[in-house]
UniProtKB/Swiss-Prot annotation:
Protein name, UniProt field: Glycerol-3-phosphate dehydrogenase [NAD(+)], cytoplasmic
Native organism taxonomy: Eukaryota, Metazoa, Chordata, Craniata, Vertebrata
Family: Belongs to the NAD-dependent glycerol-3-phosphate dehydrogenase family.
Enzyme category, top tier: oxidoreductase
GO CC annotations, alphabetized: cytosol
Keyword terms of this UniProt record: Cytoplasm, NAD, Oxidoreductase, Phosphoprotein
Residues where NAD(+) binds: G10, S11, G12, N13, W14, G15, A153, R269, K296, Q298
Short name of one Pfam family: NAD_Gly3P_dh_C
Domain of life: Eukaryota
Residues with PTM N6-succinyllysine: K289
Organism in which the protein naturally occurs: Bos taurus (Bovine)
SUPFAM superfamilies recorded: 6-phosphogluconate dehydrogenase C-terminal domain-like, NAD(P)-binding Rossmann-fold domains
Amino acid sequence: MTGKKVCIVGSGNWGSAIAKIVGGNAAQLAHFDPRVTMWVFEEDIGGRKLTEIINTQHENVKYLPGHKLPPNVVAVPDVVQAAADADILIFVVPHQFIGKICDQLKGHLKADTIGVSLIKGVDEGPKGLKLISEVIGERLGIPMSVLMGANIANEVADEKFCETTIGSKNQAHGQLLKELMQTPNFRITVVQEVDTVEICGALKNIVAVGAGFCDGLGFGDNTKAAVIRLGLMEMIAFAKLFCSGSVSSATFLESCGVADLITTCYGGRNRKVAEAFARTGKSIEQLEKEMLNGQKLQGPQTARELHSILQHKGMVDKFPLFTAVYKVCYENQPVGEFIHCLQNHPEHV
């Protein structure tokens, strides 16, 4: 029996860190094909193609410099070619690009392909909230799991100990993905509440923007802790309103929940850019260009999508933190008023 073929759809900071793990495991485990393809959006780096650099130097010099990728990870610039014959697709691209990628892949996959989304964000469908894994699953007709956790990519690539959560309705798929991705320093728990796991991954980026505003305005640790707690309460309230499946508080205690929220509010790029926004008054777009080396922020865009859903349901005032982040980012509300928005939070009534 030939091993299962794996394709990583995406090659940014997080995609490259995951490629390091998946490539290492696939080379050692008999029931995976050792050759792992990684779709790379082709870029010119100092006159050379990024795919060529990755395939000769085994390093993503743009998005994960200083880390060697296993030689069995092969960069491919054509997404259809990269995913050809794949049994497992790992999706790890900015959420705003997933629709276009699915359109390209549609009709080109094996009948029994399974997918896992590492993408943190939500989409706005005609009936309100659409999770990214749902978008992929529906467009491609494949069963989807998700992986979310307190996983800052550079630390994962450095092989520093951390945990993560796989949400999978299908237990066999969950175990297969765990085997493919778990290492001694990347520990995985599998749970069945896919929707809750994914909602956590998306919403924590909005809270992190709020935490960054808090840092930029010079508030202390007490204020930031309050922002994190109120953010968590809004995440739970939102999940209970909008998830189709069951939502248990226990899932919020997994790595995908409170752990990911804490690490993102202290160490992630959404926090970093939001702090600079509060300090400098430059636009989010400008700071993205200056600070992120071509990466995209997920927090502000998720806040906008969420705001639209909450408006549609007439529930904006039930989520003051999410709403305040949206208004500061998109409606020119002074960032200095951010804390005022939390002083009359429903949690305190």
